[in-house]
Amino acid sequence: MNKRVIVYVLGAVLLIEAALMLLPLLVAVIYRERTGWYFLWVLLGAAALGALALGLGGRKRSAMYAKEGLIAVALSWIVLSLVGALPFTLSGQIPFYLDAVFEMISGFTTTGSSILPAVESLDRCMLFWRSLSHWIGGMGILVFMLAIVRMDGGQAIHLLRAESPGPTVSKMVPRMVDSSKILYGIYFGLTVVQIILYLAGGDPLFDSLCNAFGTAGTGGFAIRNDSFASYSAYTQTVTTVFMALFGVNFSIYFFLLRRKFDLAWKNTELRWYVSIIVISTLLITFNIKSLYHGDFGYSLHHAAFTVSSVITTTGYGTENFDLWPEFSRVILVLLMIVGASAGSTGGGLKVSRVVILMRAAKAELRKILHPHTVKVITVDGKPVSGETVRAVSTYFILYVLIAAASVLLVSLDGYDGSTTLTAVLATFNNIGPGLGLCGPAGNFAFFSPLAKVVLCIDMLLGRLELYPMLVLLMPSTWRKK
């Protein structure tokens, strides 16, 4: 294993994180918050370590292969979170380091699960850093690195494949580095449009920035204790629309920019994604209408916001959906599992995987009924290879096994089944709130240290699509041959 190239990547990540910490430091200066100085000390330390790692890793640095790419990605996200948590603990805003690490892993993985009972108790620089972590993690820190750091295309593809969500990673243009620049260009552009719309609705600049960062990364860290409940209907509607937009595969936007409208519209995953949102919203609207005195418009507004928030794994809330009827709650749990589109900033199993699994199951049933019939599985009018179907099936099996093991470990805390199960689903699928004690009106502070560590690992597993973390944790990875 080429450890030098891994050290080099970690060094670059530390330097980028140090540079990004200048932003919350600026916020602290503007609002005259003393806690902001802790960002200065941490960024100086991170910059020094990053420069050292870059120097050590840059000497005689050889090629990066798939194994190194997976390990570099997993370690980068862990280091990013461990360093990002330091300002919270050093300043005393989150006294226990494990809680601060939980908060930052939740931030960078765009989960949005929080250990804070009252977020408004944090200084603005800390709130800004929490929200910014969503924006950084949404598209991926290493995608950002590839957009600004020169790296060989062969090495870049291993990093991008290890970090990007979805069954496959395709090049939008011949050079991988150019693809990462296009991705971040689209990401940045959509974020700016959302900020402008917030400002046009009268929201303060600070709120507009933080809420746009959380929406873009489909993260869900709110800066108000009631999440989005106290914002205007206009702001809630803008958020509903943009949560859904950031849950779309970003290659769709690339097609639209290239005026390839037919490719965008014929995309199977996009059609399923839109259909799931529309059908789920209508079902929940009619189910909760009686709770809101038969007001269809009001029910539709909150159902649309919640469905968009849950399927994209954002986690913002306007209502405590844990109080909704069982039918609506079951739909939301299913949406937690399905998740957003591959190639988006959302989490979950991904719509594309669900489509392939369902079509593979349908083909298998037809084969049982008609053994001599050859049924080819297609997506977007193209045949899906047997290798892709096997890869998706393997991923699903691992997904179920890890979720089951996590539920078993978290259940040692002795909380009710709804709380335990949805805490795992909420973190593993990078959603944020679950049901029960960790629902929209609750938090994750009450869990034991062991449960918090398990949930932290689940957040990383979910965001990195299992394999980077599994390779990192496998003993055989570190054995000398």
Q: Where are each of the predicted segments found?
A:
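Membrane-proximal intracellular helices of multi-pass ion channels
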Residues: 1-481
